[in-house]
């Protein structure tokens, strides 16, 4: 039986545009399929799955084949605890070169004073941020006040008192229902809430926007050590100049989590006061989402925090992932291009177009629209919870995620909303015409969902139904869009048997 690679090369023979990247990609799949069939099949099935759905989960995107290839090599075998040129292991010169180049590229891309590229995820970056702030602003001064050089010099009693002092300091951040992330400290199940006294600020009940005057009032009242700004489900931009002034007025550290909108900063969409880099003390982000890189984290900071962040090992990290850092470097270089800037602007244009068509059809959007890459539909008037809408849309080939809304009566599992994003569809090349078609499909599906009745004749809050004719029409329209805008068109699915 001919291998995948052989079939691919036969089909590609004589065709223009054949490149090494797609050949290498197929060679890797070919090897996995023959040597470890179950794993290889699952990888291929995932490729087929992603090519059969409109990916509209706001936190997901598509990375380039170059980014993916960078992670599949012997860099994964190298331990390199520490920072470039200051490792706890020998023979790290090649990893040093890659990490240094990655950090320098990040500084160039974002105009930052310092960059740290080791975090394995956005959650790791956020944990490192709070640990660096605690160490710099609370622990360090306390050790010095007691007349010691390091924390290891403290007695057990003094150390216990220091931990209690740290726990009394306030961290003020956006609540989960107002668009914050669980790592912003206001979810008690998360480790962040166990480090400091974490308090939330909310969006306005009237406008569903963050109220800077209210945030300033809370800051004056609670005098936080840390003010967190950022979001995972908020469809507007933030004014970081105002937030910096609010933080400075009480001496708080301004930490911005831009995991969702880093690509819009890199692409020059968010500028001046909407760009957090000139205002924040520490900025954290993921490298996937709107940046289109590998799954991972990244930190940017002022020089004040550079030394502490670079001591992530032993502060909270062990060995970094050099193969992922190599992929981050490639993604950051891709983000420096003119094409990426065009992409970033199109992401926002597409989100606005999508929002306009939803509103034209009478759907209610949180905040009344969007000016970033995402939007949140309030399903309350339709009488269906977010989990049901998510499942039904998935069944017709549209991937979205359920999402809480302010004062959500359905809770975090069912929710009263769904969140949609345009980064992935924009990566496929879709524009305003396609956004209109997508909106029309989604509206028709949502308006035809009914809740199933349980055995006791009550409506289910976990299962819904869609008329078969509506479902088939939606599937056909989704398939047409995907056929016109295929994922990785250079990878011929006909060879993946």
Swiss-Prot record:
Binding residues annotated for (6S)-5,6,7,8-tetrahydrofolate, in chain numbering: 176, 180-182
GO terms, molecular function: glycine hydroxymethyltransferase activity; pyridoxal phosphate binding
Modified residues (N6-(pyridoxal phosphate)lysine): 289
Localization per record: Cytoplasm
EC number: 2.1.2.1
Catalytic activity: (6R)-5,10-methylene-5,6,7,8-tetrahydrofolate + glycine + H2O = (6S)-5,6,7,8-tetrahydrofolate + L-serine
Site (Plays an important role in substrate specificity): 288
Keyword Cytoplasm tagged: yes
Protein name: Serine hydroxymethyltransferase
Organism from which the protein derives: Chlamydia felis (strain Fe/C-56)
Source organism phylogeny: Bacteria, Pseudomonadati, Chlamydiota, Chlamydiia, Chlamydiales
Gene from which the chain derives: glyA
């Amino acid at each position: 039986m001919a291998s995948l690679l052989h079939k691919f090369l036969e089909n590609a023979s004589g065709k223009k545009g054949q490149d090494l990247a797609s050949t290498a990609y197929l060679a890797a799949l070919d090897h996995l399929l023959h040597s470890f069939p179950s794993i290889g099949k699952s990888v291929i099935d995932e490729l087929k799955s992603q090519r059969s759905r409109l990916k509209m989960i706001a936190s997901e995107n598509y990375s380039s084949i170059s980014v993916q290839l960078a992670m599949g090599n012997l860099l994964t075998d190298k331990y390199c605890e520490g920072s470039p040129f200051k490792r706890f292991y020998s023979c790290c010169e090649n990893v040093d070169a890659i990490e240094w180049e990655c950090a320098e590229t990040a500084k160039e891309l974002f105009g930052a004073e310092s960059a740290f590229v080791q975090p394995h995820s956005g959650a790791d970056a956020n944990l490192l941020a709070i640990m660096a702030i605690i160490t710099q602003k609370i622990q360090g001064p306390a050790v010095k006040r007691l007349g010691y050089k390091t924390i290891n010099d403290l007695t057990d009693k003094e150390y216990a008192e220091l931990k209690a002092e740290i726990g009394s300091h306030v961290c003020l951040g956006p609540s989960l229902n107002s668009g914050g992330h669980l790592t912003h400290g206001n979810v008690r199940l998360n480790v962040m809430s166990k480090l400091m006294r974490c308090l939330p600020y909310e969006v306005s009940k009237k406008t569903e926007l963050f109220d800077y005057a209210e945030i300033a009032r809370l800051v004056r009242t609670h005098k936080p050590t840390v003010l967190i700004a950022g979001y995972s489900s908020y469809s507007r931009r933030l004014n970081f100049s105002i937030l910096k002034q609010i933080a400075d007025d009480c001496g708080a550290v301004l930490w911005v989590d831009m995991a969702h909108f880093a690509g819009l900063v890199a692409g020059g969409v968010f500028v001046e006061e909407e760009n957090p880099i000139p205002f924040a003390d520490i900025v954290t982000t993921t490298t996937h989402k709107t940046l289109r890189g590998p799954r991972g984290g990244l930190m940017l900071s002022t020089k004040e925090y550079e030394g502490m962040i670079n001591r992530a090992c032993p502060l909270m990290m062990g060995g970094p992932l050099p193969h992922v850092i190599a992929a981050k470097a490639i993604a950051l270089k891709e983000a420096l291009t003119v094409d990426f800037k065009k992409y970033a602007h199109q992401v926002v244009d597409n989100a606005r177009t999508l929002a306009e068509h939803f509103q034209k059809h009478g759907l209610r959007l949180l905040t009344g629209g969007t000016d970033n890459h995402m939007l949140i539909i309030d399903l309350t008037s339709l009488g269906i919870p977010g989990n049901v809408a998510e499942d039904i849309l998935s069944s017709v080939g549209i991937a979205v995620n359920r999402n809480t809304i302010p004062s959500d009566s359905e809770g975090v599992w069912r929710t009263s909303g769904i969140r949609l994003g345009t980064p992935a569809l924009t990566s496929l090349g879709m524009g305003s015409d396609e956004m209109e078609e997508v909106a029309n499909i989604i509206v028709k599906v949502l308006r035809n969902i009914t809740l199933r009745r349980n055995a006791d004749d009550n409506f289910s809050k976990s299962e819904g139904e869609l008329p078969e004719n509506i479902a088939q029409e939606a599937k056909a329209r989704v398939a047409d869009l995907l056929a016109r805008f295929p994922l990785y068109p250079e990878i011929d699915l006909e060879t993946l048997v």
